[in-house]
Structures are given as structure tokens and as C-alpha cells.
């Protein structure tokens, strides 16, 4: 299970730059709007909206922006009607890729996504071609400065977590999506600061990439991250730390 949060952490560091912040806000606003449209504007009764708002607050999104996004979703303000699309395919070295999109123009999005895959030497596949390789899980990341593994095991497992793992520079708590909020709440109630918390797709197995393929994969993920219509992407690539550090 090693490396679940590696790319999320890298994206988080990159996202701290001012040049990236506007793009991050755009994607968060889309997610908040769609979450409010589908489940209503009350974060207490809408888990998806609650997660989106938490992510927005973690990025210091202004309160006015956040509230406007919710109102656009509930129809209190006029907004764009986004469609959710999932693309599946293969990247460098044949790694499996899932790409989640929110778009107001499906033709534009498929053209952009297809181009990104093609440029990386990959291709978009048929529905279901790689989704079976991933499990939907809650993922909570905690710095080793915040807690120790025994404490997290006690707090997490008692609240319904499936596993607690040592990932070198941090601990990861894995949950069933249905237990995510309860486990997250228990960790916070114990006074432990959470570094990152999200419901994500975790690969059942990973494909190791080395050398040029690994470098190509990092550039591919960068391109996916830069596409406005792509909200999230997941892969089963296992990339050496030194490749990340060198790029």
C-alpha cells in the first residue's frame, strides 16, 4: 500500500505557489458547486460537500468564494451546469489511470484528455478497463510529529479504520468510505492534527516504473493536473523518490 499520498503531497507543495492557486480554487469551486447541486447546501447532511468545503478551507479559500459556490449549486445564484465524467486508460509503462472530470463541454474535455494521454504515449481505454484495479477508500495522512503508530492504531481502529500504515515520513489511516467521517472525527477529537484527509481510489497493486518511463509518468501527471476540466486522477504507478526529487 506504500505511496498512497506521495503524489497528493507533491501536488500540495506545488499548489502552494501563487501561479497554481487560481487553478486550485477553480477546481475546488467546481466540486463545491456540484456537491451542493447533488446533495443540498447543508454540510452536516452532505458528506461530499463537507469534504469539498474542508479542502477549500485547507487552501485558504475566501469565505465569500465558498458561499457563492454553494449558492450556485443550490440554485440560489446562477451558475454553470457541470457534468461528471470518468475516463479510464493507460499511461507510460502501461500503468492504469483513472481520470475524474467536471466539465461544461464534453467534446472539449475528451479532446484535451485524449491529447494528454497520447502525448505521454498512453491511450484512453473502454469503460471498466482499469477501474477494477482500484478500491474506493478513505485516506487520512498524519505527520509523525503529531502522533505515534500505537496511538493511531488505538484511536483509528476503535473508530472503524481498516488499517494504519507507516509510510516513512508519515502515517496513513485507511477506512471504508462509509466510516471515513467517523474515523476522521475520532482522530480530531483525540487532538491529533490531520495533514490530509480524502476519499480516494487506492490501487490494489502497483506497477514499478524506472528511468525514462518514470520521468515520463511524472510529466504526464503534471499535464493531467494542469488540465482545468480534470478534478482528480489516480494511477497504480510506483515511482522512485529520486525521480521526483530530480524533477
UniProtKB/Swiss-Prot annotation:
The keyword Oxidoreductase does not apply. GO terms for biological process: regulation of DNA-templated transcription. It is found in: Cytoplasm. The keyword DNA-binding applies. It comes from the Bacteria. Keywords: Cytoplasm, DNA-binding, Transcription, Transcription regulation. It holds the Pfam family Transcrip_reg. Its main location: cytoplasm. GO terms for molecular function: DNA binding. InterPro entries: Integrase-like_N, TACO1_YebC-like_2nd/3rd_dom, TACO1_YebC_N, Transcrip_reg_TACO1-like, Transcrip_reg_TACO1-like_dom3, YebC-like. One of its GO terms (cellular component) is cytosol. NCBIfam families: PRK00110.1, PRK12378.1, YebC/PmpR family DNA-binding transcriptional regulator. Belongs to the TACO1 family. This is Probable transcriptional regulatory protein HRM2_04000. It comes from Desulforapulum autotrophicum (strain ATCC 43914 / DSM 3382 / VKM B-1955 / HRM2) (Desulfobacterium autotrophicum). The lineage of its organism: Bacteria, Pseudomonadati, Thermodesulfobacteriota, Desulfobacteria, Desulfobacterales.
